[in-house]
Amino acid sequence: MEESITGLITSFGFSSPEAFIALLVVVLAVIGAVIVVITFRPLMEYYPYTYPNARVRAKIGKILNEKQIAELAESESLEEVQNFLRGHKDYAKFVDKYPIEQALDANLAESYDLLARIAPGDLKPTFDLMLDQWDIKNIKSVLIAREAKLNEEETRELLVPYGELKDDQDKLIEADSVQDLIVALEGTPYAKILEEALPDYNENKTLLTLESALDNYYYERLLVKSSSQADDNTRMLHSYIGTKVDIANIKIILRAKADNLTYDQIKPYVIDNGYQLRGWKLKEFMESEDMNSLLSSIESSEYGSIVADHIPEYNSTKSITVFDEALDSYERNMAKNIFRKKPFGVGPIVGFMNKKEIEIKNLKIIARSKRGSSIPSSEIKEMLL
């Protein structure tokens, strides 16, 4: 028996049974290594998300649900809304320190700050850049305050206590003009952005010229920064951010065409290059002769089905709100789909961002509705996202 096995082995070209056994061990080791790689590769992809997602899921659990938001819409006063928020730890420290809208912005900024601190390596540069939105928001608030001739205290109440410029807010508040603000921002990229937009502003005296220049700077960098193709997680985050930019552009152009604005009047307010809507397509949208022409152009784009389903309702009401709501719904559903597809990856992070932004927007709607003349709760609920 032993001789027959030896003969069989040598017939395959092996000099001895030992040589055959050695090769067999090597082959089994290689197969084992392949199995290990196949088994553990997904785990290695998701391992960096273990801690961030634990933190984020805990935060998602604290998001106010629809019932709580509806109850707040039915509250009798702004003070009642504030008292409710004082019962929630994440809001209490801000509600007791700032006016209500400033408190809500601070809570949202804190959420983004958390994401920037805990984001996995491939996502961290994108979330670090997202923190710039608070500097830009504050610069825009100072511009608006100067236009409205608000005093320093009123201006301070508009600012979010976050961002790289947090410690320089006093200098920004003291600026009496756009030129003064540029001087106060010297050494930051925002000084150059405003300086380049200043001639157009001096010509048309429209703050949107300066605000749009800041928005373009932020979103163009964000699209580039998030465009890493490291894995499915980075690609999905990029697609979500890119879609938000595209939706913002579509909304701007829809409003502009509803007001019969021309290409030259619209262009300064549109983010030059979107995600799926490249420059040439945006140009086509802006050059549309009227709303019907614009809707036809949008129908031929990646966002066509969203708009097409609501054209009959628009034709009936002549209100672009139907498109705004449809686009907002598309963005929400996209976040939910990413959550479902990547529950152990970027999904919870994207889901939290979307849910948190909606929560803050709804709370602002309710807070504004409780000021001054009373608005029926039924009308407030219709405004909620």
UniProtKB/Swiss-Prot annotation:
NCBIfam families in the record: AhaC, PRK01198.1-3
Family: Belongs to the V-ATPase V0D/AC39 subunit family.
Signal peptide: none
GO biological process: proton motive force-driven plasma membrane ATP synthesis
Function text: Component of the A-type ATP synthase that produces ATP from ADP in the presence of a proton gradient across the membrane.
Compartment(s) of residence: Cell membrane
Subunit-level organization: Has multiple subunits with at least A(3), B(3), C, D, E, F, H, I and proteolipid K(x).
PANTHER family, A to Z: V-TYPE ATP SYNTHASE SUBUNIT C (PTHR38682:SF1)
GO MF annotations, alphabetized: ATP binding; proton-transporting ATP synthase activity, rotational mechanism; proton-transporting ATPase activity, rotational mechanism
Keyword hit for Cell membrane: yes
One GO CC term, this protein: plasma membrane
Name of the protein: A-type ATP synthase subunit C
Coiled-coil segments on the chain, per record: none
Listed InterPro entries: ATPase_csu/dsu_sf, ATPase_V0-cplx_csu, ATPase_V0-cplx_csu/dsu, V-ATPase_V0D/AC39_subunit, V-type_ATPase_csu/dsu, V-type_ATPase_csu/dsu_dom_3
UniProt keyword Membrane present: yes
Membrane topology according to the record: Peripheral membrane protein
